[in-house]
A protein has these predicted regions:
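A glycine-rich, hydrophobic/aromatic-adjacent loop/helix-cap motif
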Residues: 2-192
Length: 192
């Protein structure tokens, strides 16, 4: 059971609000007010390069059935869980319903919610927020590439700035986020 200060989502003495990250958020938090460095002992979550972003990158998202991989986390400098959630939505350019917040109701795309709730409760965090965007590939929202070859094939079609951004995203993804598709994508860009 949560005590009063946690149930209200307000930071009390010694209570931490944290963000989970696995992609560009880790190396480019933008407006997100992080406290200290990213920690490498985040929850293990089902992630894959499965969402084509507006700029053409194939980004890491929570993906049903994907191989679970370790994530990262950092403490945030906000006074309520809702403020941390709103800040992450702003950084991601996403609607609030696409940003998870625990404790609370699962986001629309709830993949990983149970694991995050268990991890957050076990650490005694006051609130945990994360990006809860769905896979999107080949114009289909909610579906990712069928396999690594399809993902690599898509990346092989990119040119110019889109190719540069996509290559940077794969290259700079945290080392511990070794998804099932990652080796094939690195080979596409000859990343070593």
């Amino acid at each position: 059971m949560l005590d009063g200060k946690w149930a209200r989502g307000v930071r009390g003495e010694g209570v931490k609000f944290v963000c989970i990250g696995w992609g560009s958020l880790v190396w480019d938090p933008g407006v997100l007010r992080c406290v200290g460095d990213w920690q490498t002992d985040g929850p293990t979550l089902p992630l894959e390069f499965a969402r084509v972003s507006r700029d053409g990158r194939l980004t890491l998202v929570l993906t049903p059935g994907a191989e679970p991989v370790p994530t990262l986390w950092c403490e945030l400098d906000y006074h309520t869980g809702e403020a941390a959630q709103a800040a992450l939505a702003g950084r991601e350019g996403a609607a609030l319903h696409a940003i998870g917040l625990w404790p609370g109701h699962p986001p629309r795309h709830a993949t990983g919610y149970a694991e995050i709730a268990q991890w957050g409760a076990g650490r005694g965090f006051g609130a945990v927020t994360w990006t809860a965007l769905r896979p999107r590939f080949d114009g289909v929202d909610g579906a990712g590439p069928k396999d690594a070859a399809a993902a690599a094939s898509y990346l092989g079609t990119l040119t110019g700035d889109a190719l540069v951004r996509a290559s940077e995203y794969v290259r700079r993804a945290p080392d511990q986020v070794r998804t099932g598709f990652r080796a094939a994508l690195e080979a596409t860009f000859a990343v070593t």
